[in-house]
Amino acid sequence: MLREASSLVGLCLALQVAAFSEPLIKFAAPDLVPHGASQIVDHAFASFSFPAHWLPDFAGNNSHPNLFSRDILDLLDRTYYNSSQKESIFVETGANGIPSAVYVGPVYFEAFHNFPGSLWSFQANLANNATWGLNNTLEVCEQVMNTLKSSLITFEIGNEVDLYPCAVRPCDYDIHDYLQEWTTYADAISESVLRGNRYGLDEQKFFQALVFANAELKSFTTPNAFNGGIDLTNHVKSVSLHHYAAGNQAWVRLQETFMNHTAVVANLSIYSPANNYLKSNYPDITFLLGETNSDYTNILMNQVEGVFGSSLWLIDYLLYGMSLNITRFNLIQGTTFGYTGWVPVPTGSMQPYVRPPLYGQIVVADIIGQNPHVQIFPIDLGAEHWKFSAYGVYESTKLSKYVLVNLDEWNSTTRYPRPTQKVTLNFPSGVSSATVQRLLGAGASADSDISWGGLSWNYTHGRLTQSGQPHHEILRITRGMAKLTIPSTEAVVVTLG
């Protein structure tokens, strides 16, 4: 027994030594934007998606606006409109936080006023197969248009129609049946709602199409939809597909599933064929992930969702999506969803609060910054560095930032000290210094005490409040090179001086 115990101690010590001795990684991004960099990034790249039943929580109404959500910001296919309904919203309970039906009244639409300056895409109901379904959709679309006016940018018809067969449609329902329905609805909305509108909205090319749950499933593919004639009437403005990194499978782990650059690459690369098809054949139609986040089951998997490690995953996820020329990610939010960036209303004994994923989005917003010509270049580190990701950021064709994410999972309960990764960075000639900002948390499983560049945010008396002091380090550059240390489970943004 003593001999076995000694062997175990020796193994643990060897693991500890290995944890502290990470090999040096060298990074070099070209001075000028290289081939393989992204298209110019839309400054609305990291947007939000609100299911219909959660919108009142996040936005409020005219008499009780949710100023907490408004500060943070400075619809699903099961929605039916009832013009005589006094309540803003009535929900029929469903599974995983998703209702089986949502009934909304006129007060519901006041929510849109509470995010001034925002642009909206509204999802019109297609799943309702009742005889009154189309008329109800037309009624709600008209109400939405008259509420949002010029802030409305698209109508999206249907939600995850590739999952309709054997659910809300017959089992033999296929892409051709969908195209007939979609065209009928688009023609009707164009003719009855958009035609002659007073808000300058395009009367024809105003629809976000497909909205599939998968990159491809049986006959439901992007090429099949366009070869089948979805744009023969020139209705399609954009194409949306949905993506979630995982569900609640037994194999889901924070390190292997999320804090894993190789997994991020594999997850998002399956959308490249659809995106490339559109760019080659329909270059004026934009491609986006119109509903995306970490977990499609929407349950509280606290060990992988809503923790500091998920904010690091989100940074890598969004930046790699930019590098693939996906135009926008709409990050779905929900009051009870484990991955939501903030809880907008009191729940149980808890007041509203900010959750770790929001920090990932704040960091990405700062990475994009204010320059109108930002491009992202993924730095290939090889398969051996799957727990580290790196990007060069270019502004007006010139290297302006490095983004470095150490995805190695570490927690305050881990039985060895926090490892560090030493890196060297190359810089253009003439650059003598850079600033370093860090996204810090106590560990991958931390759900509080997070800071970005020295600042933290949370809810106080109905508003978003900021605490801390802005903080950055100065990185001295010698002969075009500098060294930097990045602890495990940390992200760093290096901005050239």
What are the residue ranges of the model-derived segments?
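Conserved, mostly hydrophobic/aromatic
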Residues: 48, 155, 160, 239, ...
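Noncatalytic carbohydrate-binding groove/subsite architecture in carbohydrate-active enzymes
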Residues: 133, 137-140, 174-314, 324
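Acidic, Ser/Thr/Pro-rich beta/coil linker or hinge segments at domain junctions
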Residues: 417-488
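Carbohydrate-binding surface patches
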Residues: 382-430, 438-443, 492
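Solvent-exposed loop/turn segments at secondary-structure junctions
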Residues: 51-56, 78, 125-130, 158-165, ...
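N-terminal catalytic cores of secreted or lumenal carbohydrate-active enzymes
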Residues: 20-205, 209, 217-224
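Fungal secretory targeting signals
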Residues: 1-24, 282
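Aromatic/acidic polysaccharide-binding cleft in carbohydrate-active enzymes
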Residues: 294-389, 396-398
